[in-house]
Amino acid sequence: MKLSAKSGRAFTLIELLVVIAIIALLAALLSPALSRARMKAHQVVCLGNQRQINLDFRMVLEDGNQRLDQLEFRDWERDRTGDRSATLPAAKGVWICPSAPLASHPDALSWGEMGTVHSAYVWYDPGEGLHASGSYSRNRWLMIAALRQAYPEDASGWDANYPEYFRSESDIARPAFTPFLADGVFPVVYPRASDLPPRDLIRGDGFLFTTNQMRFLSIPRHGTRPNPVPTDWPTNQPLPGAVNVSFFDGHGELVKLDRLWQLDWHSDYRPPAKRPGLP
């Protein structure tokens, strides 16, 4: 009887170990699927955020008789872009993508920091003493006309350095292909058709003063991407992943990274036959 009791206890322990092993195996099998579902949910929330921001922008546009050079645009960009606060202990709201939340405490940063594929940027306005954080980049080609009105003393500089900016809504030939907002690592971007993609897909080769600003958008924040995200991706290979883009006509969609070069970023934009860097 004693031997039988011992055998029973040993068998129960083996059963328990088998159950644990099965649970671990199922967890390993389900983990990628759960991760994909979570990423998809984040992408949907992110796209909804962009639509709300775009709606706010459209309301300002309509109140100003559809004029891109109205001063209200400059006011909107200054006062209502990014999550703004004097402290910002935890940035929330429509400017923060759940796939790229705030990584650093803004008050600990002197001038802010670039974002990454996984985190929001932080921008500091010394004039107002406020931080603005966000996960989305505005197409600055749409805002320069308003900046010229707000700062006429700088108009010649805008005209010389950024002659392709949209001067009026009539310059926008294809509103459904003209980006207003996109996932990015910096508040504003000036993309050009000749821009090369980044090698660092985490930071978008995040050098603040680069003239190659398509890099600020070429981060695989959504869609199918390698894990971990590479920091030395060959520029002659198709880019993985995608970003959410909100367009001037008000709609938004998930755009694969290589397709960013096929959108109408400024008034003189000519989409290349293939993305720069591809053989």
Which residues make up each language-model segment?
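N-terminal single-pass transmembrane signal-anchor helix
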Residues: 7-38
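Juxtamembrane interface helices immediately C-terminal to a transmembrane segment
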Residues: 29, 38-49
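Short, well-structured segments within or immediately adjacent to enzyme catalytic domains
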Residues: 44-279
